Amino acid sequence: MGARASVLSGGKLDAWEKIRLRPGGKKKYRLKHLVWASRELERFALNPGLLETPEGCLQIIEQIQPAIKTGTEELKSLFNLVAVLYCVHRKIDVKDTKEALDKIEEIQNKSQQKTQQAAADKEKDNKVSQNYPIVQNAQGQMVHQAISPRTLNAWVKVVEEKAFSPEVIPMFSALSEGATPQDLNAMLNTVGGHQAAMQMLKDTINEEAAEWDRVHPVHAGPIPPGQMREPRGSDIAGTTSTLQEQIAWMTGNPAIPVGDIYKRWIILGLNKIVRMYSPVSILDIKQGPKEPFRDYVDRFFKTLRAEQATQDVKNWMTETLLVQNANPDCKTILRALGQGASIEEMMTACQGVGGPSHKARVLAEAMSQVTNTNTAIMMQKGNFKGQRKFVKCFNCGKEGHIARNCRAPRKKGCWKCGREGHQMKDCTERQANFLGKIWPSSKGRPGNFLQSRPEPTAPPAESFGFGEEMTPSPKQEQLKDKEPPLASLRSLFGSDPLLQ
């Protein structure tokens, strides 16, 4: 314990024992607290010897401070103790732990300000460029660095590969950062093909230059000495201005960013070209039935980049059309998420749509719906028989059981004809038809067919007006009197006497 308590001695120890643990409290720091701090430092794999110097205490504070918010009470107590110990080493008069923490915070703020000031001074001393490619030389003069061939090559390769797709615009903006109108013209001149698109770009630049001249008219009178003339539209486009004038405008006070203005005109023309090369409207981007939602979102935002609209309109398109043009499966999920769902939440929710498990679930639901529909149709048409058909016993004649399970006395003989000596399966008695006769009949044709075919006879002569009327015979008159009301049906139930 003596080695651990040897952190303080003499006057420092007296000052240590006068500091209170809490403001207005009675308890004060003792040697046992130093012993506890040494053990805690060992537990946290820190060197307890750092407590003997103010520099070591600062190192401990810097090491522990980031973990204070999420640390335990022991860690916070250790931090407070080291802060008080630092004040004792520096002979800073504090009455309690809170004052020591305030002093530490004040010292850290001053140190941070000094560090930031030193970094700013160093950056200012080492600063070479204010607006690349306009750089400051060793004499403090602003000079121009020509755009590198590597940048030009990257731009040409993008145009050749992408052919003015929507991603060409951000690529041009990145490669032309801080460029002068002369640099921008160099980038445009390196484009060999797509001359129709380049002509459209020139027309847009000319229109914007004319609009600039209309909004910024030339002031009457001579230009004051030492002051530059105001740039015209053609000056901004780099056709009537020199490189030195462009640099002077861009670095003057007040500065006129002719490079950024010209760049904005070019991007406006590129938007029109992208629109021409990408004729697909955002309204036509719809998700296919088997297309993953991720691929659909990629196509949607790629087309959205080519839309000439404000950011508010694009946000509305994203919130409305992205859900509206999704396939039915994804649309159901997205509408369940509600308004204001982020793209991450949408993609997470629709991640499994279109996969095997989802297809199986959809197929099962569809089959279930078809089955329920068919059942309902059958019940409506009366084709669905809800009750079972009861069987009838051949032995007793009752329903509800079969002869094998019948408890009544077993009937003797054939169950079909009622005669003894054989069973029903060996019965030779044939089933009678609906006429009450056995079919087939040994007498020839069945009773519902004509038994004989009448020979055709010529019509009576009197029907044609030939000769005299024939007097009917007594036999025919007798048959006529006995003729039944429905003589035509007699052929169905026996021999027809008229045909014999």
From Swiss-Prot:
Residues 109-118 have a biased composition (Polar residues). A zinc finger (CCHC-type) spans 391-408, 412-429. GO terms for biological process: viral budding via host ESCRT complex; viral translational frameshifting. Signal peptide: none annotated. Residues 14-33 are annotated as: Interaction with membrane phosphatidylinositol 4,5-bisphosphate and RNA. A motif (Nuclear localization signal) lies at residues 26-32. The modification Asymmetric dimethylarginine is found at R388, R410. Residues 189-227 are annotated as: Interaction with host PPIA/CYPA and NUP153. A lipid is attached at G2 (N-myristoyl glycine). Residues 217-225 are annotated as: PPIA/CYPA-binding loop. HIV-1 lineages are divided in three main groups, M (for Major), O (for Outlier), and N (for New, or Non-M, Non-O). The vast majority of strains found worldwide belong to the group M. Group O seems to be endemic to and largely confined to Cameroon and neighboring countries in West Central Africa, where these viruses represent a small minority of HIV-1 strains. The group N is represented by a limited number of isolates from Cameroonian persons. The group M is further subdivided in 9 clades or subtypes (A to D, F to H, J and K). This is Gag polyprotein. It comes from Human immunodeficiency virus type 1 group M subtype H (isolate 90CF056) (HIV-1). The lineage of its organism: Viruses, Riboviria, Pararnavirae, Artverviricota, Revtraviricetes.
